[in-house]
């Protein structure tokens, strides 16, 4: 009974936290599944430069930045560049700044810069001394999960996933923390990825199948978007059985939201097979229309 009360309290708190925020249901433009890959590919990040789209995966063998080949009926990947960080890797996010990729490694919760041309890699020497919660006290598997960049201001945004969740702003010129904060009135208590687009920060709240549009100057949510109708059916997700939501990669390009799924090797659900003709255990990418700002 106590457990039931706690669950009900959580959902009530989540609902109350979003009161006053209109949630826009996103329109599906396309959905495609990865093909021609031997083994497991746990998609964890997506970004682009010009017409080229790049993705990453979070297993120890995925020491590559991959080029995504978007095709009529599916998508494939091919290694663009390989890197050696000199440590164990669990790459959970990517963002681009000119010819440099910034990667977050949840294995040690550090940020790395990788040259897209030759794979030369270096760790950013960020002073973490200002953190309210020292990294050594972070829960395992609850560290950096999202990264985004404001190229004009040269500000890097890092998302700590959960327990507790917060965003860290980094001045890339000085490699120091500008500020650290959480965002109120969100759909859930996690961030799975970030993307900076036209002055706003977008964050995936994967356990609520929701995206928050955040004003980085006020730290407030200005719009909520939901992909629940296109990514679930009566509680059944694209991949089952799973405990958590699995959307872990976020990109916005030319007014289109790209969401990638890290399915952890889980097979697609009956819902995904029937509605989208998906199959097997490889990840999908979903394209959704970004509504006009209100």
Could you tell me what each predicted segment is?
Residues 1-25:
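Bacterial Sec-dependent N-terminal signal peptides
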Residues 21-294:
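Sequence/structural signature of beta-propeller domains
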């Amino acid at each position: 009974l106590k457990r039931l009360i706690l669950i009900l309290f959580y959902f009530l708190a989540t609902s109350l936290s979003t009161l006053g925020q209109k949630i826009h249901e996103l329109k599906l433009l396309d959905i495609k599944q990865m093909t021609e890959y031997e083994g497991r590919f746990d998609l964890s990040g997506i970004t682009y430069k010009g017409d080229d789209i790049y993705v990453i995966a979070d297993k120890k063998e995925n020491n590559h930045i991959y080029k995504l080949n978007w095709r009529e009926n599916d998508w494939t990947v091919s290694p663009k560049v390989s890197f050696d960080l000199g440590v164990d890797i669990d790459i959970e996010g990517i963002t681009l700044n000119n010819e440099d990729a910034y990667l977050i490694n949840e294995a040690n919760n550090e940020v790395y810069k990788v040259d897209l041309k030759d794979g030369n890699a270096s760790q950013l020497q960020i002073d973490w001394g200002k953190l309210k919660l020292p990294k050594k006290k972070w829960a395992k598997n609850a560290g950096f999960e999202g990264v985004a960049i404001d190229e004009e201001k040269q500000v890097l945004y890092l998302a700590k996933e959960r327990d507790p969740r917060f965003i860290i702003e980094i001045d890339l010129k000085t490699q120091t923390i500008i500020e650290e904060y959480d965002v109120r009135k969100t759909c859930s208590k996690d961030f799975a990825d970030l993307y900076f687009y036209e002055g706003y920060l977008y964050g995936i709240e994967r356990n609520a199948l929701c995206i928050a549009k955040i004003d980085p100057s006020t730290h407030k949510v200005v719009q909520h978007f939901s992909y629940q109708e296109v990514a679930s059916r009566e509680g059944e997700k694209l991949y089952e059985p799973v405990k958590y939501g699995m959307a872990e990669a976020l990109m916005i390009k030319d007014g289109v939201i790209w969401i990638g799924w890290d399915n952890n090797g889980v097979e697609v659900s009956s819902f995904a097979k029937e509605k989208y003709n998906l199959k097997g255990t490889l990840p999908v990418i979903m394209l959704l229309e970004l509504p006009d700002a209100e």
